[in-house]
């Protein structure tokens, strides 16, 4: 009898495997890592860190593919998103984004004006942070092969603040959130569901390096940092808890959620903690520096609502990661959400697919 190589429970790949939640983790753990895991330089991070020649600095690199629908949305488009997304992944490793590559998969019949508008948007974001384009590629596919336009990007940057890792949480660390959550996911949901909101709700899509740069140049102890994209804040915190085998306690009252986002969540029965963001990051930092770090973030428009939302209450000395799907069963690796009355519940790792093609 042929030995089964994986424990993956599906014969075909479900849509939920692209959610950034438990199903994504399962796909990576059971299909990709058994074959490719030994080759990974930086497993579990949004960007890999490597050395190049005689350079005194390390470099961070991240690749990402963008398939959002619709390709134009309130607050941005797929072009802006592709630059912000890759740039932010590199910045989360304490690096300054410097170079980017672009790959365009274009559906036959896409309007010239639509494509040009997206290219102009890319140019605007590249110029904003002085990124340099190393290489680019275009493919045009027969109508129906894809939906309008997909973009792949790879970003490279020089590491200015080393040691940042989801495995580096320490007991007592303060958890900082840079901005209100859920705006990107809620705005895309509202657009697709045809919810007519008389408000300013729009995606928070933005490059975060400029806001974070002052932290990279100082003696700040940033142990972990992640932008809360697919799976939202819930996915980030649960990934950290799993990687560091830590218990994280979050104060629900300290998490800022715009009223428009709350409204969409109530209408559609969503949890804001699980909604995607494209201009929000979480940090786990040395407790004695947390207030100063918050003040620095608040000095930038993108971080004006930065706040301490919780802390790391326990860290296992073994740091042996468990399955993300079983966080709630583990005595250490879990995220606990405390409400204003003092009641506590687990902030669950996202299950299923809330919204396909969110980024």
Residue ranges, per PLM feature:
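N-terminal amphipathic/basic leader segments beginning at the initiator methionine
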Residues: 1-31, 330-332, 347-355
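Helix N-cap motif at beta-to-alpha junctions
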Residues: 285-290
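Short Gly/Ser/Thr- and Asp/Glu-enriched loop/turn motifs at secondary-structure junctions
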Residues: 43-45, 275-280
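Glycine-rich phosphate/pyrophosphate-binding loop regions near the starts of catalytic domains
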Residues: 14, 22-177, 183, 188, ...
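Acidic, Ser/Thr/Pro-rich beta/coil linker or hinge segments at domain junctions
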Residues: 300-359
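Active-site-proximal betaalpha loop/short-helix elements
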Residues: 20, 107-109, 201-277
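Short amphipathic alpha-helices in soluble, non-transmembrane regions
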Residues: 292-302
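Short, ordered loop/turn segments at secondary-structure junctions
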Residues: 18, 65, 105, 137-139, ...
């Amino acid at each position: 009898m042929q030995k089964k190589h994986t424990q993956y429970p599906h014969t075909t790949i479900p849509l939920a495997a692209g959610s950034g939640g438990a199903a994504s983790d399962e796909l990576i753990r059971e299909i990709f890592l058994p074959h490719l895991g030994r080759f990974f330089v930086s497993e579990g991070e949004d960007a890999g860190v490597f050395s190049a020649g005689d350079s005194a600095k390390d470099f961070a690199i991240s690749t990402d593919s963008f398939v959002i629908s619709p390709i134009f949305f309130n607050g941005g488009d797929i072009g802006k998103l592709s630059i912000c997304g890759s740039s932010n992944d590199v910045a989360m490793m304490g690096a300054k984004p410097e170079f980017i590559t672009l790959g365009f998969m274009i559906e036959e019949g896409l309007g010239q004006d639509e494509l040009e508008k997206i290219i102009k948007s890319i140019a605007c974001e590249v110029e904003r942070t002085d990124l340099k384009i190393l290489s680019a590629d275009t493919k045009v596919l027969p109508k129906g092969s894809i939906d309008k336009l997909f973009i792949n990007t790879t970003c490279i940057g020089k590491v200015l603040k080393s040691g940042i890792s989801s495995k580096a949480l320490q007991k007592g660390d303060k958890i900082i959130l840079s901005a209100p959550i859920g705006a990107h996911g809620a705005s895309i949901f509202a657009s697709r569901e045809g919810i007519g909101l008389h408000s300013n709700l729009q995606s928070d899509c933005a490059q975060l390096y400029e806001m974070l740069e002052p932290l990279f140049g100082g003696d700040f102890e940033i142990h972990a940092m992640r932008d809360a994209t697919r799976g939202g804040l819930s996915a980030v915190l649960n990934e950290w808890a799993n990687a560091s085998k830590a218990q994280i306690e979050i104060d629900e009252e300290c998490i800022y959620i715009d009223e428009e986002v709350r409204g969409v969540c109530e209408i559609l029965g969503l949890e804001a903690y699980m909604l995607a963001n494209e201009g929000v990051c979480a940090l786990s930092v040395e407790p004695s520096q947390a207030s100063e770090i918050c003040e620095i973030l608040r000095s930038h428009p993108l971080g004006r609502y930065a706040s301490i939302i919780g802390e790391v209450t326990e860290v296992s000395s073994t740091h042996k990661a468990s399955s993300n799907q079983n966080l709630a069963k583990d005595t250490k690796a879990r995220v606990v959400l405390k409400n204003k009355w003092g009641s506590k519940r687990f902030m669950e790792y996202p299950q299923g697919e809330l919204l396909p093609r969110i980024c």
